[in-house]
Amino acid sequence: MGKANRGKRTARRTSKQRAKRWLRNMSAGIIAGALTLVLGGSPALSRCSRVQSAVESIVGTSASNTVSVASLGDIPEYSDSLWVCIDADGAHAQGTPSFSDEEVARAKQGSFLQFSDLDSLSRCGTAFARLGTDTLSYEERQSIRSVYPSGWVQHRYSFVDGGGLYNRSHLIAHALCGENANEKNLITGTRAMNTEAMTTFENQTARYIEDTGNHVLYRVTPMFEEGELVARGVHMEAQSVEDGGAGLSFNVYCYNVQPGVTIDYTTGENHAT
């Protein structure tokens, strides 16, 4: 996307979105200036410079998670990290996505957005898309309160940001696809999973698309155990299309947990630990 076009779209952001971006850029600028004094050179060095690398390592996106497992079947019980990387290696620090050759080929043909039908327990299934500048949304999200995803038993806690334990969590974020009250795209997710874990990777995806104008193959699968109404977590995968994953690539499992709260995943009931 060209700079002029990005400027026009950015102008439509809500004040809250602008404030978040301003704060992130301000933080990066302050740290970049400080590192320049220490390391020497100009803050306008290329992305490969020592300053840029140091800035990315400090204020990046919180995506450099040290916990990694070989496969989705090896996910450990939650301890203190909100997500784990799957099949990570030197070229894929945030995990290697498992898209098939056919899925990658489909992504090269054009954008698509598909959601699974709800199952017999009214649970969501996999959400799958090719995202790009044509799918990003800068409009204010509409109300989604009309949707009550499976396991929605809301209680409030003083130690949870915003009070409510649960969010109506988009599998594919509204900012990435423009979907609002789509029951096939909303699950019962904890505040921690929705705003700390998933948002980390959603923001990476949006920034990559905005910065490059390229496309991203993207898949999110809620992970339910048999008969349970609340997902134990979500499996998120992404791979940039035009550069074969060189610009963006992740395969992570985000835990649907909230520190200090015990959740009955069968019913959605919950209480302070």
Residue ranges and their predicted role:
Residues 99-273:
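Domain-level detector of nuclease and nuclease-like folds
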Residues 40-61:
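Sec-dependent signal peptide cleavage junction
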Residues 1-23:
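N-terminal Lys/Arg-rich, disordered targeting/topogenic segments
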